[in-house]
Amino acid sequence: MTFQAIATHPQDWTGDTLALGLTTAAIGETLSSELQKLDQQWNGVLQELISDSEFKAKLAETTTTRIGGSIRKLILVGLGESPTTEDYRRAAAAVAKQARSFKSQTLAIAFPPSDDPAAIASAIVEGISLALYKDQRFKSEPDTASGPSSIELLGLAGQEAAIARAEQVVAGVELARQLVAAPANVVTPVTMADTAQELAAELGLELEILEADECEKRGMGAVLGVAKASDLPPKFIHLTYRPESTPRRKLAIVGKGLTFDSGGYNIKGAGSGIEMMKTDMGGAAATLGAAKAIGLIKPDVEVHFISPVTENMISGRGMHPGDILTASNGKTIEVNNTDAEGRLTLADALVFADGLGVDAIVDLATLTGACIIALGDDIAGLWSPSDDLAEQLLQAGKAAGEKLWRLPLEEPYLDGLKSPVADYKNTGPRAGGSITAALFLKQFVKHPVWAHLDVAGPVWSDKEKHYNPAGATGYGVRTLVNWVLS
């Protein structure tokens, strides 16, 4: 699938399928002057289609007809009243799915002129590419239906750089989707490390992988406590992108990487969704996806991508409820729930990131069911002691169409994590569980410019939503990239 930005006007374009994005104002009591010209050229087909289908131009609403002659199919897609970048993205996705159903080979898409044509071009590329993504690695009879092979963005000549960057971001999202969607017998700590090695070789990134013995030398008792029960070795991944010039800032992204979470001795029972615990490395997947995108884009920012990758399994040598672990900053943790293991692995990863001398740290993790209860499946939780960093992430998420909601770091809640035998317990009272999880992590990062994202809900969708097919969404990659580039 190739994208090309051209200056051609819709009335001059010829090809398989033409899509027009229309606002509600454009089809009010009378068609806009531009649409009237098209309607005259097409012998009234446009007005007839709008009237007969009762098309209202609601966001992502579509209607179609055959024109004949130089254009086989016409798609009208609604943009609503005042379209945002995310609206353009969703409208483009709706067009892509219609074009695929028509088996269109060439597609042209025209949206109204904008003050930010680069944003529109990027949104079209992202919306179409992400909507048409298919993961058929594990299908014995793959679905051969595909979308258009050639897509032209009308009226957007000169936006080649925006198209290229959007394609680079999409490549990162697709990597994250593939990692999250694959089962735990395919994606393991070992294969995650292999993926990091491939990224390093492909993109010229620096790579450091700490094996279990090195983790032990560094006092990473929290991550090693989780890893003990698995037959597969843990892999502590540290990828670094360094620009050729002096970086304008240095950042660290830390992703939780549990390739499977059985719950340990606090095993996940029936109805717990244990079969979906392959997704418990969604934070690490987004981290590696962001590494791919950043490595392709090559901004003037130094970025460290960190993920402690392991399984949380059950065996005779496994972590027991009641065990006390010592993290690499010397703080001790009473494990009162072996199924709250992600925060243990992140504890050592945050201490590691804290020692890199970066300007800001962001971690993301499929950390708590409590966050899903609070915010639902589509919204990630955000905690940060830094108002500036929180605002940066909120704006990055808004631009990406990835929803974030800031929640409080309510310090009095930390009392619920105090242990009579260690510094902290790894879980507190049931109420406010996502807040106490964030407070737990805060004990392992001294840096004041730090944020925690709980992405437990949006890394997976059971049904198709906009440009996300059912399954892994790749959530977080686009927000992280926007943040790094900001």
Curated annotation (Swiss-Prot):
Q: What is its EC number?
A: 3.4.11.1, 3.4.11.10
Q: Which UniProt keywords apply?
A: Aminopeptidase, Cytoplasm, Hydrolase, Manganese, Metal-binding, Protease
Q: Where is the signal peptide?
A: none
Entry binding sites for Mn(2+) 1: 261, 339, 341
Which Gene Ontology BP annotations are present?
Answer: proteolysis
Keyword Cell division listed:
no
Q: Can you say what this protein is called? A: Probable cytosol aminopeptidase
Q: What organism does the record attribute this protein to?
A: Synechococcus sp. (strain ATCC 27144 / PCC 6301 / SAUG 1402/1) (Anacystis nidulans)
The taxonomic lineage of its organism, from the top, reads: Bacteria, Bacillati, Cyanobacteriota, Cyanophyceae, Synechococcales
Q: Give the gene symbol.
A: pepA
